[in-house]
Curated annotation (Swiss-Prot):
PANTHER family noted in UniProt: 1-DEOXY-D-XYLULOSE 5-PHOSPHATE REDUCTOISOMERASE, 1-DEOXY-D-XYLULOSE 5-PHOSPHATE REDUCTOISOMERASE, CHLOROPLASTIC
Protein name per Swiss-Prot or TrEMBL: 1-deoxy-D-xylulose 5-phosphate reductoisomerase
Residues the record lists as binding Mn(2+): 154, 156, 223
Keyword Oxidoreductase: yes
Gene: dxr
Pathway annotation: Isoprenoid biosynthesis; isopentenyl diphosphate biosynthesis via DXP pathway; isopentenyl diphosphate from 1-deoxy-D-xylulose 5-phosphate: step 1/6
Keywords on record: Isoprene biosynthesis, Manganese, Metal-binding, NADP, Oxidoreductase
Record-stated family: Belongs to the DXR family.
The species this protein was found in: Acidithiobacillus ferrooxidans (strain ATCC 23270 / DSM 14882 / CIP 104768 / NCIMB 8455)
Length: 393
């Protein structure tokens, strides 16, 4: 009988974390939950603890951790260790009982614990884009150095991975994008978009930050940068195609004219199950795709005037240096301001563009350089935010 594989889920209370737990719970003979981490959703984390009984839980803030300790004590789960803070996050990722790490913390906060998993030689399921956007060269160097198995979880990159084979004869990859909730809106209506409207994605269930990124198409821009590092292709061989139905998750075109596509219902449990089982397959709980009765599949080129964030991401990738680190930091600041009602939707791109225009740092040699550039870019973005932010009308 095979031993179960110990798994740590970084970002367990987020949408990817919950989908991972759903898949894992279908295969109790294969997995055991060793560690879970979360940000501030104490009640949700307590419920996960009652369902999955991890050895360790890490919350971002000490207050949340203390609340959780009390709640677990009341529930008779005092044996579960509860910690807080960045170092505890990293420790969860490198625990001796952990074999595999689902890296699903959103944003720059996911970089250090994911690197900790890599340096500890764990198998890493990468759902955090920012590791590659902020520190692509350094991150992939560590992956090679520690001979780590790195499997992509983003539906687009997972689709490319499934179609990529050995990478021989690839002409280009085509990342598909839904176009978000505002693809067909009249341009004048975009000026008064609210956070709730931006977070209402037509096809996918996602967190608020990534939903806004989808609405601006910055999400696809970050995925272009991620694809560059994962598949070692220049920007000129990575294209984006709008596909509103989100049935084809991405395509790979070969020099002989063949185009391989991966299809499936828009449910993150599919790429998660693919990665968890690779090179085998496992049941995910996702329903079969019904092509006969499903929607017609449509495609269109993205309008870069309508989606300037996508153009900014391509520019940052081609500029090289630390431009992608600056892009990511400025976008996180701008999106948070929009979600809090301090910045109009259409000014998100302006904050990012102005920050990119002011900072052109060289490529970082060390992780400390990445973190310093990230911090500087946030400070510059906040200054531009003060100029562009006028609140929501």
């Amino acid at each position: 009988m095979e031993m179960t594989r110990g798994i740590c889920i970084l970002g367990a209370t987020g949408s990817i974390g919950k989908s991972t737990l759903d898949v894992v719970s279908r295969h109790p003979d294969q997995f055991r939950i060793v560690a879970l981490t979360g940000n501030h959703r104490v009640a949700e984390m307590q419920l996960l603890c009652q369902q999955h009984h991890p050895e360790l839980v890490v919350m971002a803030a000490p207050e949340a951790a203390q609340q959780l300790r009390v709640g677990l004590g009341d529930a008779g789960l005092k044996k579960i260790q509860v910690e807080s803070g960045p170092e505890a996050l990293a420790e969860a990722a490198r625990m001796s009982g952990v074999d595999e790490v689902m890296a699903a913390i959103v944003g720059a906060a996911g970089l250090l614990p994911t690197l900790a998993a890599v340096e500890a030689g764990k198998k890493v399921y990468l759902a955090n884009k920012e590791c590659l956007v902020m520190a692509g060269n350094l991150f992939m160097e560590r992956v090679r150095q520690h001979q780590v198995t790195l499997l992509p979880i983003d539906s687009e990159h997972n689709a490319v991975f499934q179609c990529f084979a050995d990478g021989k004869g690839v002409r280009r990859i085509l990342l598909t994008a839904s176009g978000g909730p505002f693809r067909t809106w009249p341009a004048e209506h975009l000026a008064v978009v609210t956070p709730d409207q931006a977070c209402a994605h037509p096809n996918w269930v996602m967190g608020r930050k990534i939903s806004v990124d989808s609405a601006t198409m910055m999400n696809k821009g970050l995925e272009v940068i991620e694809a560059h590092w994962l598949f070692d292709l220049p920007a000129s061989r990575i294209d984006v195609m709008i596909h509103p139905q989100s049935i084809i998750h991405s395509m790979v075109e070969y020099v002989d004219g063949s185009v391989l596509a991966q299809l499936g219902n828009p449910d993150m449990r599919t790429p998660i199950a693919h990665a968890l089982a690779f090179p085998e397959r496992m049941e995910s709980g996702v329903s079969s795709l019904d092509l006969a009765h499903g929607p017609d599949l449509q495609f269109e080129a993205p309008d870069l005037q309508r989606f300037p964030c996508l153009a900014l991401a391509f520019d940052a990738l081609q500029a090289g240096g630390a431009a992608a680190t600056v892009l990511n930091a400025a976008n996180e600041i701008a999106v948070q301001a929009f979600l809090e009602g301090h910045l109009p939707f259409l000014r998100i791109a302006a904050v990012v563009e102005d920050t990119l225009g002011e900072l052109q740092p060289a490529a970082p040699d060390h992780l400390d350089d990445v973190l310093a550039i990230d911090q500087l870019a946030r400070e510059v973005a906040l200054r531009h935010l003060a100029r562009h932010g006028s609140g929501m009308q």
